[in-house]
């Protein structure tokens, strides 16, 4: 099964799309059960294909560089 965080973001995204489609009238004739099935199927499909990963942040310590110049 997919990662929990990936599944959460997939559910969130698919839920937002279904809300937009239902408020604009594209899902007027659909029953609540068919909308719920659409929601679950698309969210699980997206979560199984796409894996959410945290971005890797690499912190390199800044080292001061000194140049030695001989004057004379």
Swiss-Prot record:
Keyword Transcription regulation among UniProt keywords: no
The name this protein goes by in its record: Putative transmembrane protein ORF72
GO cellular component, one term: membrane
Subcellular location: Host membrane
Transmembrane segments: 7-27, 32-52
Keywords: Host membrane, Membrane, Transmembrane, Transmembrane helix
Membrane topology, from the record: Multi-pass membrane protein
